[in-house]
Amino acid sequence: MIRPAVTRVLLPILLPLALIADLLAESAGKLLENSDDWFRGDDGRRTAANILSWQSSHGSWPKNGDTTRKPYRGDRAKLKGTFDNKATTDELRFLSRAFDATGDTVCRDAFLKGFDHILEAQYPNGGWPQFHPPGKQYHRHITFNDGTMVRLLEFLRDSREFKVLDPERHKKAAAAFGRGVECILKCQILIGGKPTVWCAQHDEVTLAPAKARDYELPSLSGSESAGILRFLMDIENPSPSVIRAVKGGVEWFEAAKISGYRYGKSGNDRVLKKDFSAPPLWARFYDLDTGKPFFCDRDGIKKDSVDQIGAERRNGYAWYGNWGVSVAKDHAKWLRRQAGH
């Protein structure tokens, strides 16, 4: 168990950018629950047309915006698509659903363009960059940050049910899914020969933990690793390698948890204070050498506590979370399933 320094953090006046991005990016995904009649009606067709207008020339969609409510009226050549912040996969799911309901070949063709783009973007080692083509900056790294690669793999897994796909694409999707899982296993960080968790991004060639933005240094990630483990626990008939990866990751989360503290609001501040009734917490980043939490400003210098960094980053990033709680819950269910086999 890790004991942090008690810190006081000012709350931002506005919602964190990551939360805003999630709220916007969920729009296309939420519409999947609508009926076939809705997709065939005026609202459904108008929404599909709006989504189609936002597709980039490569086949992807931009992030941090609602692609469902209004059409894009700018220069299509300037659209920058990405896999980050739930972009592209939700739009593709919508178009697949729209094609099933309407038979609209425009939706079909746009879906296939985006689907092929995802397959093309995958590295030979099974990883994905944040967007494709990735350029030379940190976006080229294999991107687990904010669930990017897991979301792509879930999309490929679910594509088994997509009627819009032909047999050859189904086959390619299955192969890409397998390569992606193998990439996850190879990226898992070994400490003393023991598998632990993952960094938010890994070098696309060496698979080593990699830096992204100045405050996102190579680390053991308490956030992204939770999503990866939950994904691995969803795999049917897991291989011994997947089982070993899950076991190592779950053990790391148990060892890294911060007990006896609560991180939450107190007036206009956010406070980390002693509370023995509080559920466990995890830090966003843990040092690769010491295993202790660290925090970082835009100067790229590690700090031992969050109150040692500036207000802008301190209030604009998720430095603590309850990510491991969902890991423990899913692991208990996973163990029961494995015992039943």
Question: What residue spans do the PLM features occupy?
Answer:
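Eukaryote-skewed repeat-based solenoidal scaffolds used as protein-protein interaction platforms
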Residues: R108, L112-F115, L119, K136-Q188, ...
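Bacterial N-terminal signal peptides
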Residues: R8-D22
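Long, well-ordered core segments of solenoidal/helical folds
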Residues: R46-S60, A110-G127, A175-G193, A245-R262
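N-terminal carbohydrate-binding/catalytic regions of secreted carbohydrate-active enzymes
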Residues: R45-D90, F94
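Intrinsic, low-complexity N-terminal interaction/targeting segments
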Residues: W61-K70, P124-K136, R140-T143, K194-E216
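Terminal, non-catalytic domain-edge segments
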Residues: L23-T47, E154, D158-R179, V205-A212, ...
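Solvent-exposed loop and edge beta-strand segments that line ligand/cofactor-binding
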Residues: L32-R40, G74-T88, K136-M149, K211-E224, ...
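N-terminal secretory signal peptides that target proteins for export/translocation
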Residues: M1-R8
